[in-house]
């Protein structure tokens, strides 16, 4: 399991919720906790992918890169859902409070996801450019926009690589379902209305 020393308010809430589930498991409640990277997928409107990397509902013209040179973990929602279903199907063999990490897609240098979006868009006749995400603008507007303040709280995820180990989920399931990156990105862009 990963160390539980949250540095943010959201992290503290997550830890408290997990502690409550663990305490309830002593009294017969069964819980499976699955931790994953940044979610992306078709029709997923509230995600970094759909709100930070690209603009939904239009062809991909630019791709905003949040942090070049810093690894980042991504989880394709259909893969995460499939993994969760498979874990639930095995719940009788798991301890009452079971924790798992998903490996998903590891973006080694912070560019692989953006480059996958670029490749897929190019296959559909677009010529998107890569640009750095405007963190300066987020800092400037954050005092006036709650969502941007919340975004800044999570910026550490783009400043330091955090990679979860999926050894436990692969030990239980035999493998972790992972759709090839370009296939997952193409389905995501299509679902977000970016491919026409």
Indicate where each model-derived feature is located.
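Conserved C-terminal active-site "lid" loop/helix of NAD(P)H-dependent oxidoreductases
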Residues: 77, 99, 138-176
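Mid/C-terminal beta-alpha module of Rossmann-like enzyme folds, strongest
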Residues: 83-151, 179-196
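Conserved beta-loop-beta element that borders a ligand/cofactor-binding pocket
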Residues: 19-43
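A conserved pocket-lining segment of Rossmann-fold NAD(P)-dependent short-chain dehydrogenase/reductase
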Residues: 54-75, 79, 83-86, 95
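Short aromatic/basic micro-patch
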Residues: 33, 74, 107-110, 163-164, ...
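Active-site "gating" loop of Rossmann-like NAD(P)-dependent oxidoreductase/epimerase domains
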Residues: 1-12, 25-27
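Conserved active-site helix of classical SDR/Rossmann-fold NAD(P)-dependent CH-OH oxidoreductases
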Residues: 15-22, 82
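Glycine-rich "substrate-gating" loop/helix at the edge of Rossmann-like oxidoreductase active sites
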Residues: 7-11, 37-47, 66-78, 104-107
């Amino acid at each position: 399991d990963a160390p539980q020393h949250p540095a943010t308010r959201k992290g503290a809430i997550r830890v408290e919720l997990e502690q409550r589930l663990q305490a309830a498991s002593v009294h017969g409640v069964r819980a499976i906790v699955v931790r994953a990277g940044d979610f992306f997928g078709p029709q997923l409107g509230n995600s970094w992918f759909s709100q930070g990397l690209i603009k939904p509902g239009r062809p991909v013209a630019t791709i905003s890169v949040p942090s070049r040179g810093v690894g980042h973990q991504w989880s394709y929602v259909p893969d995460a859902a499939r993994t969760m279903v498979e874990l639930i199907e095995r719940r009788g063999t798991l301890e009452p409070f079971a924790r798992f990490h998903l490996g998903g897609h590891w973006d080694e240098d912070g560019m692989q996801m953006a480059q996958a979006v670029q490749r897929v868009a190019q296959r559909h006749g677009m010529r998107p450019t890569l640009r750095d995400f405007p963190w300066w603008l987020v800092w400037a507007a954050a005092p006036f926009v709650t969502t941007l303040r919340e975004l800044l709280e999570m910026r550490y995820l783009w400043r330091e690589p955090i990679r979860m180990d999926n050894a436990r989920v692969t030990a239980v399931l035999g493998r972790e379902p992972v759709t090839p990156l370009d296939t997952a990105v193409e389905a995501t862009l299509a679902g977000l209305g970016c491919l026409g």
